[in-house]
């Protein structure tokens, strides 16, 4: 009679034999990655997280080439060295093909851990599906086919957060419209009546509104790592590049400005003519930079008596300048940082004698009506230029005011004007926060003590008012070997008790 232990040993042997057989069979169906994906150095921190803002397909493009795909993203700057390329799979009705898209830096520095970058490649014609390799499997990525509807000049506004300065918004909407530009606004959060008014302006063709979502990595707890604290100014470079890519084949010129910046054409009747003049005089440049001249303005704090004409006539130059902004020729440039692109492209620094940005730096809010000022505002930049030609003519001021009156009398606008804020509480909170966390170091040239600048470090939660905030359906992969991708779909706005940064 066999000892009782023998059957137990036989069972174990049979079990391991079965598992070995199953493993051998399964290995026949598992793809083994190429050796370059097995580099141990890569995997010290892999998989890397990459947040994709947008992807654009170009059937035809002057600078990118035909049938090109550009993916705009943000990630740890080490990804540029550790990953280097994204492997893309494009699929259309008749074929599929893999292609390698080289990562390209957009942000010009490493002051913040996460930076903007792009990946560009030629893919199959008219793709219906785009997938990115995770180093072992693939994940589908949503993309847009770029529009070719002509918009000669586009003003891309840097992402708004806790936006409440409706005075600057209304001035910009009408000034840009009258001189032939289309506004494209990125919005993180905005007080409720401002968005309601903006929706009417969007329907009238003044502007396009785009929710600008914060980064959300579903595979990470923000208490362990918050990428939003590690991107520069709510990933402003990515927003500007998104705008450039969006209008790349439909616009002649794309300008990148803040909401308190105004470009008023001086040598022509509209933006397109002024920019075309510069481009024809300097045919080799890829972009222009206009310096920023700080000004002081006055505005009525209550919308029922607000007048754009009053604001424009009371612009006073302060003879102080700030770092300027750029106007890109999109057929010659594919991405950009906040003030200039990463690549060494040829630029034209426009002299203030020709024109500059009117920076509405300081605003004095008035309680009641004052005596009417009929003077044309002077153009008096820091160069001390004594120019008889005003900043803006009486004729154009009257046209702008007439256009504002037409819009403000619409019932869909008027019912929200009365609800616009009087006290700029959010603006004060953010201004104080920025002074402490950024500008104090920047002005003293002590950048070594400065954290990555951005509104995420500002606490505005104590001020409660109805706000619209950007939202979306977030998706994250968790099983990537080399990278994990994250993105948001169906971006929209949702009402919230308080604005968010």
Curated annotation (Swiss-Prot):
Q: Where in the cell is it found?
A: Membrane
Q: What topology does the record note for this protein and the membrane?
A: Single-pass membrane protein
Q: Which residues form the GT92 domain?
A: 151-439
Gene Ontology CC = membrane
The molecular function GO annotations come to: glycosyltransferase activity
* Main localization category: membrane
Q: What family is this protein classified in? A: Belongs to the glycosyltransferase 92 family.
Q: Read off the PANTHER family from this record.
A: GLYCOSYLTRANSFERASE FAMILY 92 PROTEIN, GLYCOSYLTRANSFERASE FAMILY 92 PROTEIN F13G3.3
Q: What is this protein called?
A: Glycosyltransferase family 92 protein F13G3.3
Originating organism: Caenorhabditis elegans
């Amino acid at each position: 009679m066999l000892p009782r232990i023998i059957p137990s040993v036989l069972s174990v042997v049979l079990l391991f034999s079965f598992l070995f057989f199953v493993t051998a069979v399964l290995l026949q169906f598992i793809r083994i990655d190429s050796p370059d994906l097995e580099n141990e150095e890569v995997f010290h921190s892999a998989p890397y997280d990459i947040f994709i803002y947008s992807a654009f397909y170009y059937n035809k493009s002057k600078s990118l080439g035909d049938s090109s795909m550009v993916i705009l993203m943000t990630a740890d700057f080490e990804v540029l060295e550790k990953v280097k390329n994204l492997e893309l799979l494009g699929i259309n009705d008749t074929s599929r093909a893999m292609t390698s898209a080289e990562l390209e830096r957009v942000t010009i520095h490493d002051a913040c851990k996460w930076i903007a970058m792009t990946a560009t490649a030629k893919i199959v014609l008219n793709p219906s599906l785009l997938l990115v390799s995770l180093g072992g499997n693939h994940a589908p990525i949503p993309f847009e086919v770029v529009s070719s509807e002509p918009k000669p000049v586009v003003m891309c506004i840097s992402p708004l957060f806790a936006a409440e300065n409706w005075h600057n918004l209304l001035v910009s909407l009408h000034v840009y419209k009258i001189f032939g530009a289309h506004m494209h606004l990125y919005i993180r959060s905005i007080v409720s009546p401002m968005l309601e008014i903006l929706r009417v302006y969007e329907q009238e063709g003044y502007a396009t509104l785009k929710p600008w979502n914060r980064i959300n990595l579903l595979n990470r707890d923000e208490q362990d790592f918050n990428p939003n604290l590690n991107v520069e100014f709510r990933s402003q470079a990515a927003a500007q590049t998104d705008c450039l890519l969006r209008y790349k084949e439909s616009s002649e010129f794309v300008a990148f400005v803040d909401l308190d910046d105004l470009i008023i054409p001086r040598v022509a009747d509209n933006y397109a003519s002024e920019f075309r003049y510069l481009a024809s005089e300097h045919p080799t440049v890829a972009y222009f930079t206009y310096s920023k001249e700080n000004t002081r303005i006055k505005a009525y704090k209550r919308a029922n008596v607000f007048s754009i004409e009053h604001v424009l006539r009371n612009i006073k130059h302060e003879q102080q300048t700030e770092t300027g902004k750029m106007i890109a020729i999109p057929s010659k440039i594919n991405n950009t940082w906040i003030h200039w692109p990463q690549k060494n492209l040829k630029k034209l620094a426009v002299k203030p004698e020709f024109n500059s940005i009117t920076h509405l730096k300081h605003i004095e809010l008035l309680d009641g009506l004052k005596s009417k000022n009929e003077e044309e505002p002077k153009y008096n930049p820091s160069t001390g230029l004594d120019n008889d030609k005003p900043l803006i003519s009486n004729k154009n001021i009257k046209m702008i005011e007439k256009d504002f009156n037409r819009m403000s009398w619409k019932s869909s606008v008027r019912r929200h004007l009365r609800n616009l804020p009087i006290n700029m509480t959010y603006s004060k909170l953010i201004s104080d926060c920025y002074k402490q966390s950024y500008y104090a170091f920047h002005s003293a040239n002590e950048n070594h003590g400065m954290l990555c600048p951005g509104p995420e470090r500002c606490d505005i939660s104590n001020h409660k008012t109805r706000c619209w905030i950007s939202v979306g359906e977030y998706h994250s992969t968790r099983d990537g070997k080399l990278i994990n991708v994250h993105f948001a779909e169906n971006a929209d706005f949702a009402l919230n008790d308080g604005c968010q940064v």
